[in-house]
A protein has these predicted regions:
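Bacterial Sec-dependent N-terminal signal peptides
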Residues: 1-27
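Short, conserved micro-motifs composed of acidic
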Residues: 26-290
Length: 290
């Protein structure tokens, strides 16, 4: 009988010792397949995918010079003239106390305007004709849909057809991107805007593209690599057709450097900088003499 009691006591003790281990086993978290070092692969953002898609078509441009200025006053540093038209705040154009960050373009003849008007969450592009000395009520630009968020800084080339503007949205690499569209005379509306690609655009904000066809000069306004409330104005030589670096078979790191405008000196191989600087000097001189 004593032996039976002793056996039962030993068995009970063994079961008691096993219970914590079994409880731990039941409560133990299961490791994901692949072991404890497995990390979920992060998917690239739509902006990153768009950037990689645009990279091979980076435009071959020559950037002549650059200037860092206050974001609030960058229009004052672009030498607008009779050939290319003028730009100013929409608040000044409509003579109302509204958001002064939105701008208006007026053509060289002074009889046609494109204005951006709205607030920080929503804006729209409008056009207005000057008839008998008075500006007509602005009408929304046909063809520029709401998928282009908070559009601003419209600029139209002297052909009266090609329009550039900045906007946010799903077709943007990051923040504001620059877009180009042309007016379809037959359909009486603008064609679907296209992203200008690199190096016009970046993962930062790219606000304005203005072109003086007569002097063969262009201005790109962006806040890439700049502190808050500052922008960089790049002066470049525009091309009548888009040229790329595809035939040069550059390493990806070099192509990305050119796409990001890491050094304007690296782009001087793409044109005659001295000739372009002379055109810029003559333009500034003629503007100062007026």
């Amino acid at each position: 009988m004593k032996q039976q009691h002793l056996f039962i006591a030993i068995l009970a003790a063994a079961i008691a010792c096993l219970q914590p281990a079994m409880a731990q086993k039941r409560g133990k978290a299961q490791l994901p397949r692949g072991g404890k070092n497995t990390i979920a692969k992060q998917q690239p953002s739509p902006e990153s995918l768009l950037y990689q898609e645009l990279l091979p078509a980076t435009a071959k441009l020559m950037f002549i010079d650059s200037l860092v200025v206050d974001k609030a006053t960058f229009l004052q540093h672009i030498p607008f003239n009779d050939e290319m038209g003028t730009m100013g705040t929409t608040a000044t154009f409509v003579k109302k106390k509204i958001d002064e960050s939105f701008t208006t373009f007026v053509n060289g003849f002074g009889n046609f305007a494109i204005l951006a008007q709205g607030d920080s969450t929503h804006s729209t592009l409008y056009s207005s004709d000057k008839l008998q000395g008075k500006w007509a009520t602005p009408e929304r630009l046909a063809g520029i849909t709401d998928e282009f968020l908070v559009p601003n800084n419209p600029f139209m080339q002297s052909d009266g057809v090609t329009l550039y503007f900045g906007a946010k949205g799903s077709k943007s690499v990051g923040g504001y991107d620059l877009f180009m569209t042309r007016y379809n005379l037959d359909e009486q509306k603008f064609m679907p805007p296209e992203n200008m690609g690199l190096p016009y655009n970046s993962k930062a904000n790219d606000y304005l593209l203005a072109i003086d066809e007569f002097h063969e000069l262009g201005w790109l306004v962006t806040d890439r690599n700049q502190p808050a409330d500052k922008v960089c104005i790049y002066v470049f030589e525009p091309k009548s057709q888009r040229l790329t670096y595809a035939d040069m078979q550059l390493p990806k790191t070099k192509l990305e450097s050119l796409a990001q405008i890491t050094s304007i000196k690296d782009t001087w191989m793409n044109g005659n900088r001295n000739a372009a600087l002379l055109r810029l000097k003559n333009l500034m001189k003629s503007k100062n003499n007026k």
